[in-house]
Amino acid sequence: MSNKLTEICDTKRDHVARRKAETSFAELTARAKAADAPRGFRAALDRKVAEGGYGLIAEIKKASPSKGLIRPDFDPPAHARAYQAAGAACLSVLTDMPYFQGHDDYLVQARAACALPALRKDFIVDPWQVTEARALGADAILIIVAALDDGQMAEIEAAAIEHGMDALVEVHDADEFDRALRLRSRLIGVNNRDLRDFTIDFARTYELVGHAPAGCTFVAESGLGSKADLDAMADHGVGCFLVGESLMRQDDLAAATRRLLTGA
C-alpha cells in the first residue's frame, strides 16, 4: 500500500470509529432497510454495452489531494442530470471529506436528481460503512484491493451482497487482480494509474483483461479523456469506464460527456 493510501485509510478508520459512537448499528440498519431499492449498478453497465454503447460511470468530484479544487461551481444535482442526459450509465460520487472535499449529502442529492445507479466513491475499511452507504441510497460501493486484506475484502463484500448492492473491486496489478478473483463480485475496476509514481499505463489494463475468466464486467479507470481512449480500451475487450476529472473540468458537462461517448 502506498504511503498516501495508508494515511487516508488510517484517517478513515478514525472517522468510522467516531461515526459508530454517534449512530447505533441498529439505527443505521433501519435506515438502510428504509432506503429506495438498489437500482442495479452492474446491470446498468452491462445493459449499455449490450445495446452497443459504452458503459460510462461518470464521476462527481469536487477536488483531489494531488490536484486541489477541480470544480469551483460544484452542483451535484445539476451534474447528475447533465451526465444522465448525455448518456452515462451510472454515477460515482466522492463522499470522502478530508482528502477530496466530498460529503455524504452530495451522494444523496445526486442520486435524487436522476434515475442512474450511484457508487459511493470512498475508502471502505469497515463493513459498517457499507450499511451507511445503503442508508444514504448508494447502489454500489468500492473495494480497493490495495487497502485491504482478503478477510476484510470478504467481509465488506458480504455486507454489500446482504444489502443488494454491487461491489466495484479496484485493482492496480496482477497480484491484486488474482486476489480480486477470490471474491464473488465480477465487477472489476482496473486502475491505469501506478500508485507508486502516478503514471498512466494502459498496457497493464490490456494485460489483466486478457487473462480474465469469462463473465467479468471490466471498468477501466484513470487517464481516460477522449473517445479515442475508450475505443483503444474497447479493442482489448473493455466496454465500461470510470471518468471523473477530465469531465469535471469542462464548462459544459453534458456536451463533454457526449463528446467522450460519441466523438461528436
Swiss-Prot record:
GO terms for biological process: L-tryptophan biosynthetic process. It comes from the Bacteria. InterPro entries: Aldolase_TIM, Indole-3-glycerol_P_synth, Indole-3-glycerol_P_synth_dom, Indole-3-GlycerolPSynthase_CS, RibuloseP-bd_barrel. It holds the Pfam family IGPS. It catalyses: 1-(2-carboxyphenylamino)-1-deoxy-D-ribulose 5-phosphate + H(+) = (1S,2R)-1-C-(indol-3-yl)glycerol 3-phosphate + CO2 + H2O. GO terms for molecular function: indole-3-glycerol-phosphate synthase activity; phosphoribosylanthranilate isomerase activity. The keyword Lipid biosynthesis does not apply. Pathway: Amino-acid biosynthesis; L-tryptophan biosynthesis; L-tryptophan from chorismate: step 4/5. Its EC number is 4.1.1.48. Keywords: Amino-acid biosynthesis, Aromatic amino acid biosynthesis, Decarboxylase, Lyase, Tryptophan biosynthesis. Belongs to the TrpC family. HAMAP family: IGPS_B (MF_00134_B). This is Indole-3-glycerol phosphate synthase. The gene is trpC.
